[in-house]
A protein has these predicted regions:
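Surface-exposed, polar/charged faces of alpha-helical domains
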Residues: 81-84, 88, 95, 99-103
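Alpha-solenoid helical repeat scaffolds
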Residues: 8, 52-55, 91, 118
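Short helix-adjacent coil turns
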Residues: 1-2, 81, 112-115
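Conserved structural position within tetratricopeptide repeats
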Residues: 12, 56, 91-95, 122-125
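Terminal, low-structured helical/coil segments at or just beyond the last alpha-helical repeat
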Residues: 64, 93, 106-135
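Amphipathic alpha-helical repeat scaffolds of TPR domains
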Residues: 1, 8, 12-45, 49-53, ...
């Protein structure tokens, strides 16, 4: 797998546009992965700050937010007990990405909408999140 090599070459490119976004995104993923690996709880305030930064930067630069930022943003807000904001994040994300399975799963977990559950089971039964949450 040459993914780390590709990532390293990308960061070495001095002409990389918006590299700060990519750097912060990978820094965030690394933080989440390492805390999960050692069983340590994450710092939810830090998570919210980083996701807020990535959300705003994405919106400003591309006028659009990537689905993964909605997903991670939702998780960060939930971890920080910002329930109203997390609900808004999922709704906004689903408007932009109505076919996003992770967003649909989180929406189902919040609402227990049976039609959404049926859709997930029928059309995405083998998706890891559908399996993990035993929908």
């Amino acid at each position: 797998n040459d993914t780390p090599e590709i990532i390293n070459k990308t960061f070495e490119d001095n002409n990389l546009k918006n590299g700060h976004i990519l750097f912060v995104f990978f820094m965030y993923q690394d933080y989440i992965s390492k805390t999960a690996a050692i069983g340590k709880p994450t710092n939810s305030k830090y998570q919210v700050q980083v996701m807020d930064f990535l959300y705003k930067e994405s919106k400003e630069i591309w006028e659009r937010v990537p689905a993964i930022i909605y997903i991670y943003g939702y998780e960060a807000l939930e971890n920080d007990n910002k329930i109203e904001e997390s609900t808004k994040m999922i709704s906004e994300g689903l408007k932009e990405y109505p076919d996003s399975v992770p967003l649909k799963v989180y929406q189902y977990l919040k609402t227990k909408d049976q039609l959404l559950k049926e859709d997930l089971i029928k059309n995405h039964a083998n998706h890891w999140m559908v399996l993990q949450y035993k929908l």
